[in-house]
Amino acid sequence: MQVIRLAVTPPKDPMLPPDPTMIRDAEILSQLTDTIARFVRERLVPAEQHVAETDTIPDDIVADMKAMGLFGLSIPEQYGGLGLTMEEEVLVAFELGRTSPAFRSLMGTNNGIGAQGILIDGTEEQKQKYVPALATGEVIGAFCLTEPDVGSDSGAVKTRAQRDGDHYILNGTKRYITNGPHAGLFTVMARTDPEIQGGGGVTAFIVEGDTPGISRGKADVKMGQKGAHTCDIIFDNCRVPAENIIGGKEGVGFKTAMKVLDRGRLHISAICVGVATRLIEDAVNFAAERKQFGKPIIEHQLIQAMLADSRAEMFAGRSMVLEAARSKDRGEKVSLDASCCKLFCSEMVGRVADRAVQIHGGAG
């Protein structure tokens, strides 16, 4: 399946018309979203059971994802990506969300948290050196913020980075690192100034995956999302060149991380909307075929009410995400709105999934 490598813009969304100021070429983005929707339908959905059973995405599918440019959706064209705006990215994510999250997880870090720190705050030299390989999928990126004792209190990073000449020596453990087992490039948040409490003493580093002193823990065993891998990343006297500080400046890594997470929250919110859309479609199709009491169960009012509630919540989430994405594209601060989107959409898709299971009854 061939990638469409042109400047792209949103088509007329069937549920909420896009902001005209964000449109660059609606026809080309329509081609891109149609191509991805077909790829999801014809290649990814049929492979879902295999991925769930083997915890592995087939190599031929990964190759197709690379050929289509999916690893560089949000990476600017000058670094080999498609250069989608935030609104365009969430429109694509709506389609990618209609299949197992494992597929999106593999390439999601390259588009998001694995590359955005470099793109947002990195030097031009850093961008030229590292981003093109992320855009093609040649290298998988990962984002190292969470630690065994550092979760929601993300400014309390304990991993240390001590200056040693023209290098820094990193020591510490990062936990639940998405794509950690496969990553060839890490964005690492480490404390360079232990005297400063909170995020002010944290610096962002670019660390290559084959750097001596890096080891990877055993892949986490999860109840769901088979095929999407996480693990601990351990730094033991890992020497990183000082030139690999993102942007060349100490003490601003926490700010970089927060900027990265704004985009990531909107992307994940859009994926939740896509998952909810798939759940509703599957529930409608099942309810139309399943008969009880002499008629399809979709004709029973209780089933209709559950579908209506799910559809209304999905629409609300979709509208929220698109509005926040447009605000980000206009250069507005969206930290609060992006967090609201992720909170609502992640809880919304849980409720939709619960109703879908109920509609399927014993088959759920």
Kindly give the residue locations of the regions a language model identified.
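Alpha-helical interface subdomain recognition
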Residues: 1-109, 121-126, 133-138, 153, ...
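A short core secondary-structure module
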Residues: 167, 171-216
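A short, Trp-centered hydrophobic/proline-enriched beta-strand micro-motif
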Residues: 137-145, 189
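Flexible, small-/acidic-enriched active-site or ligand-binding loops
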Residues: 156, 212-239
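Glycine-rich phosphate/pyrophosphate-binding beta-alpha loops
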Residues: 150, 175-181, 263-267
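A structural signal for short hydrophobic beta-strand segments in well-ordered beta-sheet cores
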Residues: 159-161
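Flexible, glycine-rich active-site loops centered on histidine and acidic residues
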Residues: 115-121, 143
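Short glycine/proline-enriched turns and hinge-like loops at secondary-structure junctions
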Residues: 84-85, 153-155, 179-184, 198-201, ...
